């Protein structure tokens, strides 16, 4: 009986750690996206177009590589 209780507590703690890790990852990704979009928002439309064009050329050249 006691061993089962200990095992259940360990399983609950492992599940808690897994859930907290997932939450931290989601929060970090969200903050990263917010930072990226706020940086993009500060650029002008022409700069965004130029960056998108350069990025597209870079990706195409990398794939042809």
Curated annotation (Swiss-Prot):
Q: Does the keyword Membrane apply?
A: yes
Q: List the Pfam families.
A: SafA (PF17073)
This protein's assembly is summarised as: Interacts with PhoQ.
What is its biological role? Connects the signal transduction between the two-component systems EvgS/EvgA and PhoQ/PhoP, by directly interacting with PhoQ and thus activating the PhoQ/PhoP system, in response to acid stress conditions.
Q: Where on the tree of life does the source sit, at the highest rank?
A: Bacteria
Q: Indicate how the chain sits in the lipid bilayer.
A: Single-pass type II membrane protein
A Gene Ontology BP annotation from the UniProt entry: response to acidic pH
Q: Can you tell me which family this protein belongs to? A: Belongs to the SafA family.
Could you tell me the keywords of this UniProt record?
Cell inner membrane, Cell membrane, Membrane, Signal-anchor, Stress response, Transmembrane, Transmembrane helix
Location in the cell reads:
Cell inner membrane
One GO CC term, this protein:
plasma membrane
Q: Which residues lie on this side of the membrane: Periplasmic?
A: 40-65
Main localization, broad class: membrane
Q: Which InterPro entries match?
A: SafA
Q: Which ranges sit in the Cytoplasmic compartment?
A: 1-18
Q: Lineage from the top down?
A: Bacteria, Pseudomonadati, Pseudomonadota, Gammaproteobacteria, Enterobacterales
UniProt protein name = Two-component-system connector protein SafA
Q: Where are the transmembrane segments?
A: 19-39
Induction pattern: By acid stress, via the EvgS/EvgA system.
């Amino acid at each position: 009986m006691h061993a089962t209780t200990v095992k259940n507590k360990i399983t609950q703690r492992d599940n808690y750690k897994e859930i907290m890790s997932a939450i931290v990852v989601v929060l970090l990704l969200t903050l990263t996206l917010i930072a990226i979009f706020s940086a993009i928002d500060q650029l002008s439309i022409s700069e965004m177009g130029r960056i998108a064009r350069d990025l597209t050329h870079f990706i195409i050249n990398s794939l042809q590589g």
